[in-house]
From Swiss-Prot:
<dbReference type="InterPro" id="IPR038718">
    <property type="entry name" value="SNF2-like_sf"/>
</dbReference>
<dbReference type="InterPro" id="IPR001650">
    <property type="entry name" value="Helicase_C-like"/>
</dbReference>
<dbReference type="InterPro" id="IPR050496">
    <property type="entry name" value="SNF2_RAD54_helicase_repair"/>
</dbReference>
<dbReference type="GO" id="GO:0005634">
    <property type="term" value="C:nucleus"/>
</dbReference>
<dbReference type="GO" id="GO:0016787">
    <property type="term" value="F:hydrolase activity"/>
</dbReference>
<keyword id="KW-0547">Nucleotide-binding</keyword>
<dbReference type="Pfam" id="PF00271">
    <property type="entry name" value="Helicase_C"/>
</dbReference>
<comment type="subunit">
    <text>Homohexamer. Interacts with RAD51.</text>
</comment>
<dbReference type="InterPro" id="IPR014001">
    <property type="entry name" value="Helicase_ATP-bd"/>
</dbReference>
<dbReference type="GO" id="GO:0015616">
    <property type="term" value="F:DNA translocase activity"/>
</dbReference>
<dbReference type="GO" id="GO:0045003">
    <property type="term" value="P:double-strand break repair via synthesis-dependent strand annealing"/>
</dbReference>
<protein>
    <recommendedName>
        <fullName>DNA repair and recombination protein RAD54-like</fullName>
        <ecNumber>3.6.4.12</ecNumber>
    </recommendedName>
</protein>
<feature type="domain" description="Helicase C-terminal">
    <location>
        <begin position="493"/>
        <end position="647"/>
    </location>
</feature>
<dbReference type="Pfam" id="PF00176">
    <property type="entry name" value="SNF2-rel_dom"/>
</dbReference>
<dbReference type="GO" id="GO:0003677">
    <property type="term" value="F:DNA binding"/>
</dbReference>
<dbReference type="InterPro" id="IPR027417">
    <property type="entry name" value="P-loop_NTPase"/>
</dbReference>
<dbReference type="InterPro" id="IPR049730">
    <property type="entry name" value="SNF2/RAD54-like_C"/>
</dbReference>
Length: 738
């Protein structure tokens, strides 16, 4: 086209000084002579040019108005064949047009569909309101692609529970998977799904609070970042001034809308309890309580603060829901789904008393039958809101774990001190009806420390405390606690051998766990004496520093050989896969605490065969603690794992023998089994083929000498002070390495 005929040039000429504003402008009006001259040179085959505007001649305003409306009523069409658009993207405030769709494709390979709308016939579809039809709820493919089969099942169970589809008018559940099965990832998947979608094409919830022990706040923050990247920004709080924390909590709880900027709050139990008033002022879509067995006491302040939250949906994570008794188990179930087991008094009368009566070793056949009936009734109710998978699932993904309970003889000094204490303190007199009274707790602590090393009770000997009067005469001359002397403790002697053999014959790293920081002090002295590089984590270490030293220790190139861990401070949730050997130096009354600590190395990412050593002093209170653990573990197993034939070998009345010393045994625990697989202390028949580390100790291998051991390191350490060993492996080794 000639430039002079362009609309912009024509308009300029029209607005010139000679133009008449009142005269209608017709862009197609051109002198006839110019048009005839130009058309001489146009090919007869060329299509005629169309006018610059298709505006028809409008005789009146009505026709013009109708024409404009017709133009504006035509929707814009993207010139791509079969283009339907991405309905999942935000529409910048405009209402979306078109049929409601799921956020993700439910028919894609590997899609995890949590909800499938009911099928509607074509006839009903015509009459249905298209704006109210439910859609599929599909887990984000970024997450569903990394979920293992048991985790996909777990996410589906969690979603069904918190949306009220399993129990009417109940929106809570307990995730009771054992350690290492990915409970955190399953909960993050649930959170992300609820925040983004629902059958009604909108988010199910707007805000989530994750409450965890302070040592795991940073871990949760990192896990959210790991799996969700930058798509969500969580707020993590575990420290700071009161005003600063209150300000952050007010900002969080006051957020409103379909998609708020910071929808996830991660907070420690202690901080939540202190600032609960702020969080009680708003509504929260979901509350997740990690290590939820902290809520076993329904009367403590943390439980009351959390239970007062305006949050229907509640998920409690606990690998060990039963720790001490069934009433604590009731508290956990009552927290997530209030009322399904009645009141505490009703639960005790209806379930707890008959079940415990039937589980006692002295129970009659009638009591056993009644207890079993009540147990099945309880299981049928609770299983609707509790999911539990045991760690045997991990055998598909993790290397073999060899767990060993090592009984160590007391040294002559320990025996003399032990007998002196029992003679002077007379702790048996403080026991009543097989239950541990408050007055006997100090005696228990003294005996446990003596089993670890005489150095731990040396101060009491100096001051002549009850039970240790005249004990100084038993110590070697010129004895000093400044230097550790392994030869004075049977367990310390065995530990010294284990560390030396591990250091010289393998490339493995070791985690040392104890309930007492004083014992960790002894470990430090031993490491300095043997020139082992080590790191230590206890309650004095800040959360930020904990994360740094764990990351450094897990680095294969780091020189640290030993990681010392206080089970009270860091036994839960830590990932220490840089080591593959773990020593539990002293037992805890609660089997859950020991299991949590022992699960630090046998976790996702571990590549080497794991060896767990549980050291006990032979014939002492430590073996009684192990026996009490067996009772608690059997109780947990029969209620949560639903095992039918969990053996109970110990009557509650036998706890009266707690304060005694059996000097003539290789293992007091093995003696109580009345084991039929062993003859004269030697195993003649192996345990059942399907037995593993989760079984009762009676179904483990029993070794009165080192010939039956599978661990070369423990074999080499036997002659130090070992009297008896129970050992079992997690699963059959698929790679030929044991």
């Amino acid at each position: 086209m000639r430039r002079s005929l362009a609309p912009s040039q024509v308009a300029k000429r029209k607005q010139g000084p000679d133009s008449d504003d009142e005269e209608d402008w017709e862009p197609d009006m051109e002198p006839q002579c110019k048009r005839d001259c130009r058309e001489k040179y146009i090919s007869p085959y060329r299509k005629p040019l169309t006018p610059l505007t298709n505006r028809p001649f409008c005789a009146d305003g009505n026709e013009h108005e109708a024409f404009i409306r017709k133009i504006l009523s035509k929707p814009f069409k993207i010139p791509i064949p079969n283009y339907t658009g991405v309905l999942g993207l935000r529409a910048l405030g405009l209402r979306r047009a078109g049929v409601r769709k799921a956020l993700h494709d439910p028919f894609e390979d590997g899609a995890l569909v949590l909800y499938e709308p009911p099928v509607i016939s074509a006839h009903d579809l015509i009459k249905a309101d298209k704006e109210k039809l439910p859609v599929h709820v599909v887990v984000d493919p970024v997450l569903s692609k990394v979920l293992r089969p048991h985790q996909r099942e777990g996410v589906k169970f969690l979603w069904d529970c918190v949306t009220g589809r399993r129990i009417e008018n109940s929106y809570g559940c307990i995730m009771a998977d054992e350690m290492g099965l990915g409970k955190t990832l399953q909960c993050i998947t649930l959170i992300w799904t609820l925040l983004k979608q629902s059958p009604d094409c909108k988010p199910e919830i707007d805000k989530v609070i994750v409450v965890s022990p302070s040592s795991l706040v940073r871990n949760w923050y990192n896990e959210v970042g790991k799996w969700l990247g930058g798509r969500v920004q969580p707020v993590a709080i575990d420290g700071g001034s009161k005003d600063e924390i209150d300000s952050k909590l007010v900002n969080f709880i006051s957020q409103q809308g379909m998609r708020i900027p910071t929808p996830i709050l991660i907070i420690s139990y202690e901080t939540f309890r202190l600032h609960a008033e702020v969080l009680h002022k708003g509504k929260v879509g979901l509350v997740i309580c990690d290590e939820g067995h902290r809520l076993k006491n329904s009367d403590n302040q943390t439980y009351l603060a959390l239970n007062s939250m305006n949050a229907q949906r509640r998920v409690l994570i606990s690998g060990t829901p039963i720790q001490n008794d069934l009433l604590e188990y009731f508290s956990l179930v009552h927290f997530v789904n209030s009322g399904i087991l009645g009141t505490a008094q009703e639960f005790k009368k209806r379930f707890e008393i008959p079940i415990l009566k039937g589980r006692d070793a002295d129970a009659s056949d009638k009591d056993r039958a009644a207890g079993e009936q009540k147990l099945q009734e309880l299981i049928s109710i609770v299983n609707r809101c509790l999911i539990r998978r045991t760690s045997d699932i991990l055998s598909k993904y993790l290397p073999v774990k060899i767990e060993q309970v090592v009984c160590c003889n007391l040294t002559p000094l320990q025996k003399e001190l032990y007998k002196l204490f029992l003679k002077q303190a007379k702790p048996v007199e403080s026991l009543q009806t097989g239950k541990i009274s408050v007055s006997s707790l100090s005696s228990i602590t003294s005996l446990k420390k003596l089993c670890n090393h005489p150095a731990l009770i040396y101060e009491k000997c100096l001051t002549g405390e009850e039970g240790f009067d005249g004990a100084l005469d038993l110590f070697p001359q010129n004895y000093s606690t400044k230097a550790v002397e392994p030869q004075l403790s049977g367990k310390m002697l065995v530990l010294d051998y284990i560390l030396a053999m591990t250091r010289t014959t393998t490339s493995d790293k070791v985690v040392l766990v104890s309930n007492y920081t004083q014992t960790l002090d002894l470990f430090e002295k031993l490491c300095r004496n043997r020139r082992y590089l080590y790191v230590r984590l206890d309650g004095t270490m800040s959360i930020k520093k904990r994360a740094k030293i764990v990351e450094r220790f897990n680095n294969p190139s780091s020189p640290e050989f030993i990681f010392m861990l206080s089970s009270k401070a860091g036994g839960c949730g830590l990932n220490l896969i840089g080591a593959n050997r773990l020593v539990m130096f002293d037992p805890d009354w609660n089997p859950a605490n020991d299991e949590q600590a022992m699960a630090r190395v046998w976790r996702d990412g571990q590549k080497k065969t794991c060896y767990i050593y549980r050291l006990l002093s032979t014939g002492t209170i430590e073996e009684k603690i192990l026996q009490r653990q067996a009772h608690k573990k059997a109780l947990s197993s029969c209620v949560v794992d639903e095992e039918q034939d969990v053996e109970r070998h110990f009557s509650l009345g036998e706890l009266r023998e707690l304060f005694s010393l059996n000097e003539k045994t290789l293992s007091d625990t093995h003696d109580r089994f009345r084991c039929r697989r062993c003859v004269n202390g030697r195993q003649v028949r192996p345990p059942p083929d399907d037995s593993d580390c989760t079984c009762d100790l009676s179904n483990w291998h029993h070794c009165a000498d080192k010939r039956g051991l599978r661990d070369p390191v423990l074999q080499a350490s036997w002659d130090a002070a070992v009297s008896f060993v129970f050992h079992q492996r997690s699963h059959e080794d698929q790679r030929g390495v044991v």
